[in-house]
Amino acid sequence: MATDGASCEPDFSRAPEDAAGAPAEAAKKEFDVDTLSKSELRMLLSVMEGELEARDLVIEALRARRKEVFIQERYGRFNLNDPFLALQRDYEAGASDKEKKPVCTNPLSILEAVMAHCRKMQERMSTQLAAAESRQKKLEMEKLQLQALEQEHKKLAARLEEERGKNKHVVLMLVKECKQLSGKVLEEAQKLEEVMAKLEEEKKKTSALEEELATEKRRSTEMEAQMEKQLSEFDTEREQLRAKLHREEAHTADLKEEIDKMKKMIEQLKRGTDSKPGLSLPRKTKDRRSISISVATEGPMTRSVACQTDLVMESAEPVKKLPLTVPVKPAAGSPPVAAGAKGNACASAAAVRPGVERQVSHGDLIGASLPAAPPPSANRIEENGPSTGSTADLTSSPTPVPSTVSPASGHTPAPPPHSLHSPCANAPLHPGLNPRIQAARFRFQGSNANDPDQNGNTTQSPPSRDVSPTSRDNLVAKQLARNTVTQALSRFTSPPAGAPPRPGAPPTGDVGTYPPVGRTSLKTPGGARVDRGNPPPIPPKKPGLSQTPSPPHPQLKVIMDSSRASSTGIKADNKTVASPPSTLPQGNRVMNEENLSKSSSPQLPPKPSIDLTVAPAGCAVSALATSQVGAWPAETPGLNQSACSERSLVIPTTTASSSSIHPVNASSRRAGASDSLLVTASGWSPSLTPLLMSGGPAPLAGRPTLLQQAAAQGNVTLLSMLLNEEGLDINYSCEDGHSALYSAAKNGHTDCVRLLLNAEAQVNAADKNGFTPLCAAAAQGHFKCVELLIAYDANINHAADGGQTPLYLACKNGNKECIKLLLEAGTDRSVKTRDGWTPIHAAVDTGNVDSLKLLMYHRAPAHGNKLREEPGLAIFDLDQEEERHEGTSKPVVPADLINHADSEGWTAAHIAASKGFKNCLEVLCRHGGLEPERRDKCNRTAHDVATDDCKHLLENLNALKIPLRISVGEIEPGNYGADDFECENTICALNIRKQTSWDDFSKAVSQALTNHFQAISSDGWWSLEDMTFNSTTDSSIGLSASSVRSITLGTVPWSAGQSFAQSPWDFVRTNKAEQVTVLLSGPQEGCLSSVTYASMIPLQMLQNYLRLVEQYHNVIFHGPEGSLQDYITHQLALCLKHRQMTAGFPCEIVRAEVDADFSKEQLVDLFISSACLIPVKQSPANKKIIVILENLEKSSLSELLGDFLGPLENHSTESPCTFQKGNGTSECYYFHENCFLMGTIAKACLQGSDLLVQQHFRWVQLRWDGEPMQGLLRRFLRRKVVNKFRGQVPSPCDPVCKTVDWALAVWRQLNSCLARLGTPEALLGPKYFLSCPVIPGHAQATVKWMSKLWNAVIAPRVQEAILSRASVKRQPGLGQTTKNPSQGQQAVVRAALSILLNKAVLHGCPLQRAELDQHTADFKGGSFPLSIVSSYSSCNKKKESGAWRKVSTSPRKKSGRFSSPTWNKPDLSEEGIKSNTILQLNCNRNASLSNQKSLENDLSLTLNLDQRLSLGSDDEADLVKELQSMCSSKSESDISKIADSRDDLRRFDSSGNNPVFSATVNNPRMPVSQKEVSPLSSHQTTECSNSKSKTELGVSRVKSFLPVPRSKVTQCSQNTKRSSSSSNTRQIEINNNSRDLEPTQK
């Protein structure tokens, strides 16, 4: 049983192993608890526990059983009754151990052994169980950690997805922005087309004029011939006339004789001739009369007409200009002349002066009027307004001030508050110019007799001068003020009696009744303070307030208002903002001075009550007497009362008798005058007076607080009383910075605001948060307070600490009236808050559509009194007005403001869409410049955050952006040079809106095509605006909208001008057209437009090539390799084939590639098999044959085509040629006229015997420096860039543009250098550069591509060309130098490669120096030490650029066949510099300064070896000369642009008489550091020809030495030592030295 129990565990562990098969026994031994799962461990534990329990039971049973067996075995056979058995027991017990039986034979021993084993197993199991539990705990902890890691992984994955989404949105956003910009491109393209249309018209006109000119020339020629003929006739006639003249002279002589006779007879008959004079006199009179008539009708009449015209014009002009020019406020300092006198003077002057002279400048008027001294009477008349008699003159007189100049703004901070409507009331505010104040003082002191009648009487009839509108309105103001004050005071005072006078204050007359425009006060020389003036009157529609009739009022009102509108700089709803911003500090200074004077004046206890009727002449009534409850703002005096009639005003419900008090004004109070705390026109009760002011000067302790409370509560009476306290700070601010004016404006107490403003409270005083009273009033919607504050020059654009302007606060709270007032005042709609919100954000945030419409559509009125003349339009018809605006006018806000994003990137459209304000979103979307795809900082568009309704709206409003692509059809694969051509190019994205019509769509497509063709053919990276003016017809490639064969919208064909039933919007959405594809006409249609677009060869040139083929039948295209000869010939053949097939002729193209093994017999077989050559006896067929022979440069033209020259020139039987067939028979053949032959030669120029063939063919030379090849690469790469940017032209500073420009420059510089070296066989066409990669942001890819191109194509060609030229003139024994070049030739090749690499390739690379260093090693030959070139001067021409810097600029001695004028003009003045800059990277910079001493000897060594090694070949010498020249003065002028450190530069001059060639080399291994040998600038270099240098200087080539930074010498010299020590030749030594010059170009 125990055995079975012990075997439970192995059985359990064996169960899974048995299933595994063979390794069950091994698995049982390798049973590992760690591999079990938790459930399996639990099961194992339960099994173990059960086994242990069973084992315990078995043990107990076995123990009992053992005891029984022991007893039975030991004592069972014995019995106490049997002594023998007892003896036997004793014997057995006493026996020795050895004699006992083995224990193992006893079952109990076996059981004990089993139990001991079980105990050991139990202990082992418990140990394993404990280990398993610990591992289980560890596993649980690891699982928890794994779960945490998984959660973190999920979070990171989510963030990764979010970042990917953001990046995707950013990409989409950029793409959409590109599309939007393409829309702008379309608009500008339309302008371009218009300009082009005008240009075409001008061309047509020019051609017509040229034709007319030619016609005129012919006519002139004919007329000259006629003239010659007539002259000959005239000569004949002249001779005849001369003869006749002689006869007449003879006759005249006879007549003279007869006359003499007659005179004598007359004298005799004189006395009897009375009747004869009577006959002659009438004749004379008749003549004289005719003369007089002509004079009278012509001369005088003309003169009178002119005078009448001038007079009419001059007299009409003042009347015409009058509404704009009659001044309300004359210029500062103008003499206060009477209006009548002024008007008469001006009118009389207008009749005399020309109209031009009338436009005098403002300064002239001011200067001319300053010296005049005002007479008192004139001053008086001006103050009280023009009289009746002067009114007519005033209305007809021109203004002395230009209508566009504010009279006060040029010289004064602001007009005084009482000077709005007095024609001469504007006094200069400069301290020295105060005639206005002096006149006022004279008026106050000298007219006391009339003042009681005007100011103190109780009669209601106004004085006679009140016919003047100004004074009449002022009287109304006085009466209204008196009524309102009486109403205010009647609540707590005794009945009105009289006003208490102030001692010493002169009477004011009417000066104070003029409403103030600004708050700037005046300080008189005597210290007196001009009073703040009277508040304006209440509109006359209120009951009992209108006191005077106004019959002549309306006419003058129009004139005055219009003149005021035209004579002020800033208009705000008919309120003259008389003080420009620059005058605010001046105004504050004056006000502060006035406050100081107020605080220093003594305060006397006022009398409690004074009757106004008995007041002395010198008294003045306080502002309380003139305060008006609910009066209209100061800018609306009697001239505009009607405009205020419908405004709701705060007016007391009770009115007192208007006849009780006449308004007077407290003005010009002297410094010694006592100011009462409460002075009233009606008097005060004795019980109230002591409470307020009895017992001496009024205490000021709690006054500011009391002033705040009165203003906040709207207590007009108390506020007026406090304001008359002398020394009270009305601008006092409480703890939160609120002034009394701020409190009044915030609570909407218009009357209190007016009183405070009249008291000159600071209108722009801000609280601790930067809010002004205007901000508070606008935020609370108190539009009357806003209007009043604006009238007093409040800063409408003031921004609080958070950037909130009054307009922003008004929009934030939806106060339409305030918004309109502020907009009409000219506030800035684009001011932004601290978090980037504009008023448009605020209006949209509240969902207030009316506010948003006002912001977008409301314009400031053209005339300032528009609002007042049409009061009904003010507020109540706002919706209708704005709807009218939307329908008839465009939004006044720019697109930038509509699309402005706040600090979170949210535009107004985001806010409206996210809050579901669909109406606001619709208003925004009506703006044409809205960009609904603008994304916030979380990469969300307005559509992304919009509600469902707003999403639907945006989806319907957004324009569909469909890419427009140009396709040239499928390009046939093959070796036609078209491997890099693209079949399709995206040129732009078309914006299709709901309202887009098919006509608009056609125009957009046509315009986009025109713009694209113009863009890719322009010379630079011009924007479309620039191209409009910079493009010329020469730069065009000849493509236009007429080059289109077909257009497909998605998959549906469409033609320009075609219309479908659906609109373009619906059509594109219904058919799911993802793009518009334009297919250009190609060879299949007999056109070459697609070929032009694919290859960027101008259409005119391709058509010319085709014409040559059709006309001459034999055309050969030749040019450098890679000039697209094969592609051109194939496309021309295709076009010609389809043209012939269209004409009804069958046509076939036969291509043959010529190689070195191509024989003449093969060519004959080709011609015969293709039916080009036909037997003479056979008639030609109608079939057209086009034969293309490619790669003719691989064979000899004279050998291959020599026998065909005659027959090819004459395609007829007249020029037969006999060819022998393979069977030995010969037959005559001829080329029929339906045969065309085209050939291609990849060679820049013909040589040798091939020149004999030249005259028999028509040749098309594809030069690299002429069209079409010259601009082909630029156009091709430009189109590539445009395609990469999806139709947009990047800016010239874009890295992609710089990279493309660099690739283009590499091609040009390479060819320029190669042409200059006389190696035309190495010239490259643009084909190799067409594959230049255009990858925005990855210029390294282009550099890598360039290195591959250099290593695979350019370097091998250059090497082959240099070697071939260097060995051209060598002796036959040296003919193998090309295969086994000499050391000198190798040096020349390597030098040439290095120079080309650095001057033509690496020069101008857009990469930074550090990046370029990494790629330099990829170029073959880039690390060549250029000092070797210096030694092998005849061989190393090109690689020496950095090392040698030869100065010789004499013409290179070239072989004649290589010389070309264009090749001799290197464009390398800048490239050479760059080459040395690059090569210095390859130079070790370890040279020590001690090497400078041996510099001159090293130079001699270099030049000596230069000469010795140049003896091998003249061409090598030429090469070396060119290499030296390329490295010398051509680029030295730009060294300053390259050198990094100019502080350590050293110059070493070489003497011209140095015996360089005779120098011997004593130490070949001496390191020559030509870093120290620095070429001089071009003006310091020695320039001479070879002959000159040899004879005069003894030097054929003089080195130029550039300055070298000393810090870079050390490494190069050490490198030189290492290199030179490894060779026994001088060449290698100098090679390394030559390499040292490279850093000089840095």
Swiss-Prot record:
Residues 119-276 form a coiled coil. One of its GO terms (cellular component) is dendritic spine. The modification Phosphoserine is found at residue 1513. GO terms for molecular function: protein phosphatase 2A binding. Residues 385-394, 576-586, 1552-1563, 1571-1588 have a biased composition (Polar residues). Residues 395-407, 1613-1627 have a biased composition (Low complexity). Gene3D superfamilies: Ankyrin repeat-containing domain. ANK repeats lie at residues 702-732, 736-765, 769-798, 802-831, 835-864, 904-934. Residues 497-506 have a biased composition (Pro residues). Keywords: ANK repeat, Cell projection, Coiled coil, Cytoplasm, Methylation, Phosphoprotein, Repeat, Synapse. It is found in: Cytoplasm, Cell cortex; Cell projection, Dendritic spine. The modification Asymmetric dimethylarginine is found at residue 491. It comes from the Eukaryota. Transmembrane segments: none annotated. The keyword rRNA-binding does not apply. The keyword Repeat applies. It holds the Pfam family AAA_lid_NAV1. Interacts with CTTN/cortactin SH3 domain. Interacts with STRN, STRN4/zinedin and MOB4/phocein; this interactions mediate the association with the STRIPAK core complex and may regulate dendritic spine distribution of the STRIPAK complex in hippocampal neurons. Activation of glutamate receptors weakens the interaction with STRN and STRN4. This is Cortactin-binding protein 2. It comes from Muntiacus muntjak (Barking deer).
